[in-house]
Amino acid sequence: MSLLKKEDTIKIDAIVTSPPYNINKPYSKYNDKRDKNEYLLWLQKVANNSLQILKEDGSFFLNVGGRPTDYMLPFEICSIFIGAGYKLQNTIHWIKSISIEVADIGKKNNIIKTDSSIGHFKPIISQRFLSDLHEYIFHFTKKGDLAIDKLAVGVTYQDKSNIGRWKSAKTDKRDRGNIWFIPYNTIQEKRPHPATFPEKLPYLCIKLHGVKKNTIIYDPFIGIGTTALACINLNVEFLGTEIDNRYIEIANENIQLRYIKNKKT
């Protein structure tokens, strides 16, 4: 986090990011296979610095994953942020792929006609481990009591009778919950960065935090600009840092193209 430090006067409303997972991804300017203690100390600096630049009513949405041989890593990272002074307010599960059997849906909910597998994932070639179809999004705040805009990311009621049944159900929107199914693009040419999350992920995080006038979003590992694109669509200001000049060029191009596209529509 070289751009924003505690000495800076700017304060951030929400940070949405996904740091390298230390699982040997092929970055061109970053070693993604550090000694684990070194990696965790590095993330501790990220936690400490981010806490200083975040507003008192700010949010930090941290997307992290792991691997079967080190399944505790996401929780160790979470503990580091809590140790820095954050409160873990929500734990969101990003589901990349899911299998649904018709028998589990029931006759009343006629959603699918056949057993279905939806989404994509990288299979694990192992006789010991199941393929990992999800990652975590840890939602940190400073006090743990931040009001969030749950209906901004809400979904429609499957059973419309609930709209009149529940006092809180004033519209055809309900809490999405903490399980988010967000598939990602599998075409590598469209994912020149080895570890990008789908644009919908930061989009939902920002909306959940709440979009107000002059909202500023920061992504300290902005990569090819995915968080920035979500910000443009939400009409909020954004800042980002990235160490790889190639990714910066791609991010700038993506941002310019999005502005052009939005002006036409």
Residue ranges of predicted features:
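Conserved phosphoryl-transfer catalytic core
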Residues: Q256-N262
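Core catalytic lobe of class I
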Residues: M1-I250, L257
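SAM-dependent methyltransferase catalytic region
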Residues: I12, K264-T265
